[in-house]
Amino acid sequence: MASHSSVSYRSVRTGGTSAMIGSSGYGGSSSSRAMGLGMGAAGLSMGGGSFRVGSAGIGGMGISSGIGGMGISSRAGGMSAYGGAASGGAGGFVSGGVPMLGYGGGAGGFIGGVSPGIMASPAFTAGRAITSAGMSGVVGTLGPAGGMVPSLVSRDEVKNILGTLNQRLASYVDKVRQLTIENETMEEELKNLTGGVPMSPDSTVNLENVETQVTEMLTEVSNLTLERVRLEIDVDHLRATADEIKSKYEFELGVRMQLETDIANMKRDLEAANDMRVDLDSKFNFLTEELTFQRKTQMEELNTLKQQFGRLGPVQTSVIELDNVKSVNLTDALNVMREEYQQVVTKNVQEAETYCKMQIDQIQGISTQTTEQISILDKEINTLEKELQPLNVEYQRLLTTYQTLGDRLTDLQNRESIDLVQFQNTYTRYEQEIEGNQVDLQRQLVTYQQLLDVKTALDAEIATYKKLLEGQELMVRTAMADDFAHATVVRSGTLGGASSSSVGYGASSTTLGAISGGYSTGGGASYSAGAGGASYSAGAGGASYGVGGGYSGGSSAMMEGSSSGGHSMYSSSSMKRSSSKSASASAGGYGTSGHDSTIILQQ
């Protein structure tokens, strides 16, 4: 019966994460009654690690005596195997509440069992023993296995697992799409900031010189800030001095205004005193003239009376004699009248003179007081004028100082404005230079990171090829051990993904299976080989697991994946043993950063 082998992969490129879904083929057999059937599984890889869900198959029916292959009778049910590996020593996977072991590197992975009541094959026992050793090396001689294994996982559980993985994959894809959109937005913003300048390295820019320039600029900015503070302090001092001088000027101006007011009042008093003096002088002159006129009038009247009485006396002399006892002496009467009149005139003259003297003395006293007051006022005016002269000089000096300080303050303000504009321009220019230097530095960092990624990818690819060559040598050495009934496997663990090996056991008593070996790194290369009648292949570090069926012989598969080199390569080569047909194989890929995976399968 012809063997059939098919492997299908779907690669999803999602901006730095690659996910693969693999399915197993149909197992072959060496007789017409043996057939293997593989069920599709899924594989997922993301970031720097890997996670695989290997193929699940239902083995064919063996015709051997119960030792080889699946160790069951001709009518026994098949088996299923689930394998996987998580790079970096991740934990196992639990499906349907049943913990599964695996062949993978590190402590991760899982493997399912066969259906209840089926004896585990030596290859399965060896794979489980190797897996349980974790990252440690295993040295041992394998023999027939015994004991029971966990029950077969049902189709519903497989569907649930695949549904869960598909949901996780969809969530990862959505997240990656969102991150892609955000990345495009950030690229647009960066393009707007850089003005469309490509992020290419600038060999002419020296970061040390840039840092030195930035330090010098910051120092200059600090010095300018200190200078500005000093100028502000000087301006404040000048303003305080100007305010003090202004207050003094206002005080002196108030004193001057008060003095001018007092002088004006004194001038008004002096004018009033002068007017009073003139009035009193005029009154004095009027009274003097009136006194003179009264004297003159009285003298004229007196002279007239004297003339009258004197003319009558000598001219008319008559003696009248009366014969009366009571005769009247007219001369005596006239003399008496004259004396009385003279007394009255004298009294009036004296009263008039006394009154005039009193008025004159009063006027003279008032005039003297006024004169004294005028003299005092003149002295005070002279004193105030003398005091006002230095005040005027001080006022002129303060006014000149105020104008000078005002001009200086204006000059300082203009200079400060000019310096501030220059400082702002310098600061803006320095900020632009710093931003440009930051953009150049970011561009150089991006270029450096790209080169570092390329270097890491190349190193990982070189390491992968080295391990591939080591795996091929191991396959050649193990192929020479087909005449032995038992196989000894020695592998040592390595960091990041460790190494693992599995063996296959013969399908019959006359034909032994070839030893299958595996090797894994932390998400890097992996090799798996399956051999024997109804053996399973074991993989590590993200490899796959297949189930084969047949009478004798088998095939070996070699698979390798690289996680950091920018691509993944999977290859499979078969080694025919005896008259066997090739068994099925499936592989789960390991993702790379933004690149699709390439699958190569050879029979």
Curated annotation (Swiss-Prot):
Annotated spans, Tail: 511-603
Assembly, per entry: Coiled-coil heterodimer of an alpha and a gamma subunit. Assemble into 10 nm filaments. Forms a massive, conical, intermediate filament biopolymer of approximately 60 cm.
Residue segments, region Head: 1-191
UniProt source species: Eptatretus stoutii (Pacific hagfish)
Region (Linker 1): 228-240
Name recorded for this polypeptide: Thread biopolymer filament subunit gamma
Entries under SUPFAM superfamilies matching the protein: Intermediate filament protein, coiled coil region
UniProt region (Coil 1B), positions on chain: 241-341
Recorded GO CC terms: extracellular region; intermediate filament
Record-linked Pfam families: Filament (PF00038)
Stated family: Belongs to the intermediate filament family.
Subcellular location per the Swiss-Prot or TrEMBL entry: Secreted, Extracellular space
Region span, Linker 12: 342-362
Domain of life: Eukaryota
Ranges where the record places region Coil 2A: 363-381
Keyword terms, alphabetized: Coiled coil, Intermediate filament, Secreted
UniProt-listed InterPro entries: IF_conserved (IPR018039), IF_rod_dom (IPR039008), Keratin_I (IPR002957)
Region (Disordered): 562-603
Ranges where the IF rod domain occurs: 158-476
Compositional bias ranges of the Low complexity kind: 562-587
One MF term in the entry's GO annotations: structural molecule activity
Coiled-coil intervals, chain numbering: none
Function (record text): Released extracellularly into seawater and provides physical and biological defense against invasive organism by modulation of the viscoelastic properties of mucus.
Region of interest (Coil 1A), residue spans: 193-227
Region (Linker 2): 382-389
Region ranges (Coil 2B): 390-510
